[in-house]
């Protein structure tokens, strides 16, 4: 089993870069959507809620397939070579699917953290004459720090979800596993892949715990 590890490690860079890029895009989107939900912006609130329902209510694999194969159903897109090339790129399609999926769950996580802030803190800011936007600027960082423990699960989940990218020909860890299995028909290839995922997930969890510990250091000092 361990003799397969060097070959499988060739796909680890793709898995990690896809994870990091997806998390960055998802964080930016989740921040925007969380602010919209908190400010209760008309129309936009319903659009965000519809988006969350769509991406949390359907399987990630279906989303990947629709984003990768869907544009092929619109022949007019082929009239724009640059756009067609981008939409035919497996890495970009996987990035879009993972980002949109993760952003939906992260928005729920962050919005839940904001709603968990004691009412007294909102009232204190209001008593100081602060607008809701100014209040958010103060309370949002606190809410995000409080949600780090749960967000670490999302980080691990995104990395594990990159294993689905092989279904659209992206050669990450699982892609190389399928390639090796096709050559050897040795099921232990997947055992070796499991070891890689287990080790990386353990390191990601440890990293998030350290970040959480540092971010919440002020609570221990108090």
Swiss-Prot record:
Transmembrane segments: 16-36, 50-70, 80-100, 155-175, 187-207
Compartment(s) of residence: Cell inner membrane
Keyword annotations from UniProtKB, A to Z: Amino-acid transport, Cell inner membrane, Cell membrane, Membrane, Transmembrane, Transmembrane helix, Transport
Gene Ontology MF terms: transmembrane transporter activity
Periplasmic membrane side: 1-15, 71-79, 176-186
Domain of life: Bacteria
InterPro entries: AA_ABC_transptr_permease_3TM, ArtM/GltK/GlnP/TcyL/YhdX-like, MetI-like, MetI-like_sf
A biological process term (GO) from this entry: L-arginine import across plasma membrane
UniProt xrefs under Gene3D superfamilies: MetI-like
A cellular component annotation (GO) from this entry: ATP-binding cassette (ABC) transporter complex, substrate-binding subunit-containing
Listed SUPFAM superfamilies: MetI-like
Function: Part of the ABC transporter complex ArtPIQMJ involved in arginine transport. Probably responsible for the translocation of the substrate across the membrane.
Subunit text: The complex is composed of two ATP-binding proteins (ArtP), two transmembrane proteins (ArtM and ArtQ) and two solute-binding proteins (ArtJ and ArtI).
Database matches in NCBIfam families: HEQRo_perm_3TM, PRK11122.1
Protein name from the UniProt record: Arginine ABC transporter permease protein ArtM
Naturally occurring in which organism (per UniProt): Escherichia coli (strain K12)
Gene that specifies this protein: artM
